[in-house]
Design a protein with these regions (language model features):
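Active-site nucleophilic cysteine motif
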Residues: 96, 108-127
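Boundary regions of SH3-family modules and the immediately adjacent low-complexity/disordered segments
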Residues: 1-23, 53-54, 58-95, 102
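Short, basic/aromatic beta-hairpin or loop at an interaction surface
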Residues: 15-29, 125-140
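Aromatic- and glycine-rich peptidoglycan recognition patches
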Residues: 3-7, 12, 17-20, 76-82, ...
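Beta-loop motif signature
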Residues: 15, 21-52, 104
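...with weaker cross-activation on analogous glycine-rich loops/strands in unrelated enzymes
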Residues: 131-190
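Sec/Tat-exported extracytoplasmic proteins
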Residues: 100-104, 123, 127-131, 164
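Surface-exposed patches in mature extracellular/periplasmic domains of secreted proteins
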Residues: 104-111, 132-135
Length: 190
């Protein structure tokens, strides 16, 4: 809805307050609970402050201070995302497939346009994990899995990285990331 700066402490406080995460690909914040005038649009993973409830709507405050109403079914509490006990790979695969057909945009990280690392970071965000922004950063976390010709070592939800191996004259260069979804198939944004 709007760009705003947050300190580390403010980000930690998100789970202590009534903040919600938008869980649909697209949506709207309405000026009133009658859904007659649009304040702004929403995309998957937008974080908004919940200030009240009216029937089937949440009253919300946007980062820039504007207020409005959002349908309750489109919002989950931040705590429900970040207090998960395990990674649900079935949910990762299901959500990954909802991005089929979304336009590629270098640096994109929304359901309107997305790049490879924006794609993987959104999928893992909904599992309560915050990945670094770029593929070259994401590869530094997790556990290395040996590759073979038929992908039998991979599990659904594994991140697959692409690039150039290190040589004597140049370092390794990671330039792309995707997610393994099973049966020898991976999904990515390109």
């Amino acid at each position: 809805p709007a760009v705003s700066l947050r300190t580390q402490k403010q980000m930690e406080n998100l789970t202590d307050q009534a903040f919600g995460i938008f869980i649909r690909q697209f949506g709207q914040v309405f000026k009133n609970d009658g859904k007659t005038e649009v304040v702004t649009d929403l995309v998957l993973a937008d974080i908004i402050r919940i200030t009240g409830k009216i029937n089937t709507m949440y009253k919300v405050e946007l980062p820039d201070g504007r207020e409005g109403y959002v349908e309750k079914e489109g919002i989950v509490n931040v705590k429900s995302i970040f207090n998960q006990k395990f990674v649900d790979t079935v949910q990762i695969v299901r959500m990954a497939k909802t991005f089929m057909g979304v336009s590629y945009l270098w640096g994109g990280k929304s359901s309107k346009a997305i790049d490879c690392s924006g794609f993987t970071s959104i999928l893992y965000f909904f599992q309560g994990l915050i990945l670094q922004r770029d593929a070259s950063q994401q590869i530094k976390y997790g556990e290395l899995v040996k590759t073979n010709s038929n992908f039998t070592n991979f599990k659904a939800g594994d991140l697959l990285f692409f690039g150039k191996k290190a040589t004597q004259s140049s370092p390794e260069k990671v330039s792309h990331v995707g997610i393994y979804i099973g049966d020898g198939i991976f999904i990515h944004s390109s």
